[in-house]
UniProtKB/Swiss-Prot annotation:
Subunit and partners: Homodimer.
Record gene name: fis
Transcription regulation among keywords: yes
Protein name as it appears in the record: DNA-binding protein Fis
Protein task: Activates ribosomal RNA transcription. Plays a direct role in upstream activation of rRNA promoters.
Organism, as annotated: Sodalis glossinidius (strain morsitans)
Length: 98
């Protein structure tokens, strides 16, 4: 579950452990851990287009959730994301979300 703390620009990830305790950590920490795991699995192999891979992993769910939150209102979604509507439409098309 992703939450944004009030009065903060830090997105957090909430997790529940086996004792039903909820912990929160910044989204960037989860991304960093995912990248560490990814690099560990590479065993020294070269990687191409890592930026695009990571961006797609974050951008697609971001678009999905923003479009759900705005009930499909592209103008409002673009404003929330700080991009113009044409750019939003292009990104939605890229991920087959149009």
């Amino acid at each position: 579950m992703f939450e944004q703390r009030v009065n903060s620009d830090v997105l957090t990830v909430s997790t529940v452990n086996s004792q039903d305790q909820v912990t929160q950590k910044p989204l960037r920490d989860s991304v960093k851990q995912a990248l560490k795991n990814y690099f560990a699995q590479l065993n020294g192999q070269d990687v191409n287009d890592l930026y695009e891979l990571v961006l797609a992993e974050v951008e697609q769910p971001l678009l999905d959730m923003v479009m759900q939150y705005t009930r499909g209102n592209q103008t409002r979604a673009a404003q929330m994301m700080g991009i113009n509507r044409g750019t939003l439409r292009k990104k939605l098309k890229k991920y087959g979300m149009n």
